[in-house]
Every structure is written in structure tokens, then in C-alpha cells.
Amino acid sequence: MEYSEMLIHRIKDLCRQRGGITVLRLAKMSSLRQSTLDNIIRGNTKDPRVSTLHRIALGFNMTLTEFLDFPELNDYVFEEEEEIINPAELKKHKKTERPASNAVLP
């Protein structure tokens, strides 16, 4: 299961646990636009901002830590998005770098 799918399940589970909160009501409780929340729940927003997740957590009267503390996410292994550089390639890059200037910046 992907990170975004886990967030969707978490939001839906919390809505159910709290008496069937609707997307519109959660948006109001979270001080978010309904379209923002809809995009997250529909999977259109794959990686919501921390500030958005924080607002959702506050809407549920939780801290961000509490909101993100659930088994699926705790067991999730995030993949590195950055390119891994071969050590030999790294040496090539170091050789072509210019020496640092001794000039003092104003």
C-alpha cells in the first residue's frame, strides 16, 4: 500500500470512528477548502503538505504526531527519491570541481 493510500484510509477511518464525519464537515473543522480534502481522499494529491496534514489532525482534535501514529504508516518503508551515485562517479565529480575561492563575501 502506498503512502497516499494509507493517509486516505487513516482519514476515512477517523471519520467513521467519529460518527461519520463528512468531507465537507472535516474541511470546515480543519479550516481547509473542501476541494483540497477531496483531492487527498480521491488520491489526486499524492503527497500533501505537512501544513495540510497538521490542519486535518487539528480538525480531528489530534496532534500531527497522533494523526500519523498508526500501524500501517509505522511499518511503511519510504523509498529514496534521490538518485544514488556510484562512488566512482562521485570521484569524477570531485576532480572536476573548482577550488573554493578565498574571497571574502561582503
Specify the residue positions occupied by each region the protein language model found:
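Residue-level detection of the helix-turn-helix DNA-binding "recognition helix"
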Residues: 16, 42, 72
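Conserved hydrophobic/aromatic packing and binding residues within compact polymer-binding modules
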Residues: 11, 26, 37-40, 67
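A short, Lys/Arg-rich alpha-helix, primarily the initiator
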Residues: 1-25
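Short alpha-helical elements of helix-turn-helix
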Residues: 5, 9, 34, 49-53
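Recognition helix of helix-turn-helix/homeodomain-like DNA-binding domains
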Residues: 31-48
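DNA major-groove recognition helix of helix-turn-helix/homeodomain DNA-binding modules
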Residues: 51-66
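Short, charged recognition helix plus adjacent turn
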Residues: 39, 69-106
